[in-house]
Amino acid sequence: NIPETEKEKNDKKNFEILKYDGIRAQRMGKLPYAIKCFEEAVAINDELETLSLLATAYTQANRLDDARITLDRMATKDPEQVNTFLSLAGICYMQEDYENMKDACQKALVLDNKNPLSFYLTAKAAIGMKDDITAIAMLTKAIVLKEDYTEAYQLRAEVLWKMKQAKDAAEDIQKLLSLNPDDEQALLLKGEILAATNEPEQAQECFNQVLSLNPFNEKAYILSGELYLANKDFDKALAIYDEAIEINPNFAKAYHERGRIKLLKGDKDGSVEDMKKAIELAPENEINISGQYNNYENMTKNVPF
């Protein structure tokens, strides 16, 4: 063994200090400092663990391009690590780069074709590429490998429902609810399917169950209000949006929907007030809302449901 030089000893010591300072800073949510520590550490020694910490910190700081470059560097350094490719797939998903997401998943599957997450992420890439048939096949493979894979059942149910396969989607939802009767996402999808297949009372039961489990579930209020509106029950629709706004006074979509109902009931002033509030809370939706607002007069003649 050749004795370490003074420089090597110093480098080793500095590397350890930087790495663990970075880990501490990351745990405390001090991301810019954590990133600086990890960057300096990998400049001394680009070992995989520290590169992985750096990639995670970049991701947390929403520096996705940097995270991707770091993960590519890890894949070049050690092309046998499945998790590197799965992390890369996750970053590509966040960037809506579904082609490269699919490639990363394929590389992960070559290394290990028994990893349910690889099939699940391949399905998400397929959905992004509007290839629902492949998505169903990949989700089915994920479920075969992991029988209680709730995310895969949920996603498969959503895709099946999008393809108007209500019966198959309902079977996946039943499986989800057998695994967890309080699964909010599954209950909402069950309610959506029941609403669309002329079972409004059972649908409302699903939405009410979700709201009793979680009074902050925004989607449940919207779906419940839409169903009341579809059945011309304006007062109940108003009540549900009143409740939503009482629980969350910053719920822009609820003001928007309540504004629609008020207009249908002939309360133009109340409607305008709610619309203004919706725009104030979510200015990014302003163009959409004002465009829709111009059509409201026509909508009152023919509610499009």
Per-range role (PLM):
Residues 28-36, 61-73, 95-107, 128-141, ...:
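Structural signature of tandem alpha-helical TPR/SEL1-like repeats
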Residues 270-305:
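Terminal, low-structured helical/coil segments at or just beyond the last alpha-helical repeat
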Residues 13-43, 47, 56, 60, ...:
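Alpha-helical segment of the N-proximal tetratricopeptide repeat
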Residues 15, 48-49, 82-83, 116-117, ...:
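Helix-start (N-cap) detector for alpha-helical repeat units in TPR-like alpha-solenoids
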Residues 43-44, 77, 111, 145, ...:
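Structural marker of alpha-solenoid helical repeat scaffolds
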Residues 2-17:
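TPR-adjacent "capping" and linker segments in tetratricopeptide-repeat scaffold/adaptor proteins
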Residues 20, 53, 87, 121, ...:
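Canonical tetratricopeptide repeat
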Residues 26, 59, 93, 120, ...:
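Position-specific recognition of the canonical hydrophobic site in helix A of tetratricopeptide repeat
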